[in-house]
């Protein structure tokens, strides 16, 4: 049985899925870049976090479907960083914003 969401809930769900898409792509891209920077250990961590974020997105997508909301396909802007330090700084800032 599909439930209809309020406009407030729709907005919240759209923001949540946009953030999860954002961080999934950001961590995935950092995983690829870290491998190129010869930092296999950190690359593995970025990969694990990207997968976890994709699972979060899946859970939100299930709720979006339940409430019959048309999901956004536009993530919030990503900031990858060019160095490992910049990557970690971007990720830390993003984590603080979403707590």
Predicted regions located by residue number:
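A structural feature that tracks compact, well-ordered secondary-structure segments
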Residues: 12-19, 24-28, 91
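Acidic/His metal-coordination segments adjacent to aromatic residues that form catalytic metal sites
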Residues: 2-12, 74-94
């Amino acid at each position: 049985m599909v439930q209809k969401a309020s406009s407030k809930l729709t907005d919240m769900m759209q923001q949540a899925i946009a953030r999860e898409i954002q961080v999934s792509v950001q961590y995935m891209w950092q995983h690829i870049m870290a491998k190129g920077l010869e930092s296999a250990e950190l690359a593995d961590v970025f990969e694990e976090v990207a997968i976890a974020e994709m699972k979060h997105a899946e859970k939100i997508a299930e709720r979006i479907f339940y409430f019959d909301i048309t999901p956004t396909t536009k993530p919030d802007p990503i900031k990858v960083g060019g160095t490992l330090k910049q990557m970690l700084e971007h990720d830390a800032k993003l984590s603080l914003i979403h707590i």
